[in-house]
Amino acid sequence: MIFTEGTILAPSSILKHFNHASYIPIKNAVTKITSWYQQGAEVIYLTSCKKEKHVDKIKELLLMHQFLGQRLYYREKGQKYKDIVEAVMPDILIEDNCQSIGGWWQMCITYVKPEIKAGIKSIVVKEFKGIDDLPYLLSDLINWRN
């Protein structure tokens, strides 16, 4: 599971931070994710958007920029990120550190039940810096240490 905004997508300028329609891929995110997909990874995404029209815009961006993957998850009314992570139970969760909105307490993994968290490889990258530093090989990714 890969978080979209701040992890693989960023605003095209600082003035467009809250305009998700203007977001673009961060560095070589598409190439990296394509590599994982071609190695057999089931690639799924999680967006911060809640409103259907905004979720649809993120979906359009992912398709337009050729991000490969199977599904885009989003929070419905009353849901928290932890609810989605606990329901999906991804092997790997890649997300940014949420620095611009308060840090660790805003992250998806933070409030996941310990027994579920133990089975998830949590990888945290710096917000808006992308995933370029992560390995291309899935076998190396699962052993990656932050």
How does the language model describe each region?
Residues 1-78:
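Alpha-helical substrate-recognition element adjacent to the catalytic core
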Residues 54-146:
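C-terminal cap/substrate-recognition subdomain and adjoining C-terminal extension
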